[in-house]
Amino acid sequence: MQGLLFLFCGEVFEAETVIVAAGYESRYITRTVGIDIPMTRYFEEALVTEMQPHMFDIMLGTADADFYGHQSQHGSFVFGSDSGLEESIDKSFDDLRTTSITASAGCRAIMGYIPKLADAKIVRTWGGWCDLCFDGVPVIDRVDEVPGLILACGFTGHGFGTAPAVGLMLSQMVAGED
């Protein structure tokens, strides 16, 4: 079998096709075969409020990317936001957590558009790194220099929303239907 070798949990596997879809870590993984994906990572946060009276059914977002989110069917709001503190974050540190400082930056942006949420209690927050290609366009393609290698990365935090379509596209690529 001619294909790619890869290591997982100390074991070596061989496959005709390997998909690298590991967010920002895709850059690290592909460097092992001489491919450098022009990308970076940035920190995004999310929060959930306590239940609120029904306000609207649409997804919200701002052109400046201050925040995005929606009201769930049971009434809580789920928002993602940029803390605005990106420059002060140590990008070598992987165990980032939201704090009262970073979460409040996102809350101020949200309250600027939805003042009725000023007194809403936040019940949960979390954050994590998102991958971003320098041109803002995700990579979903074969790598000519490494036959059998397919990349799917650089989704700028939109991976969950695009996952069904991307999964179908990747399965078609693996099956040779692209």
Language-model segments: residues:
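A short alpha-helix-loop-beta-strand transition element characteristic
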Residues: 37-39, 119, 177-178
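Alpha-helix/helix-capping structural signal
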Residues: 24-25, 108, 165
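Active-site lid/adjacent beta-loop-alpha segment flanking the redox-cofactor pocket in flavoenzymes
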Residues: 51-149
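C-terminal lid/capping helical subdomain adjacent to the catalytic/cofactor pocket in oxidative enzymes
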Residues: 144-178
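A conserved short coil-to-beta-strand element within the FAD-binding core of flavoproteins
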Residues: 1-4
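Central helical "cap/lid" subdomain
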Residues: 11-56
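Glycine-centered tight beta-turn/hairpin loop motif at sheet-sheet or coil-to-beta transitions
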Residues: 8-10, 64
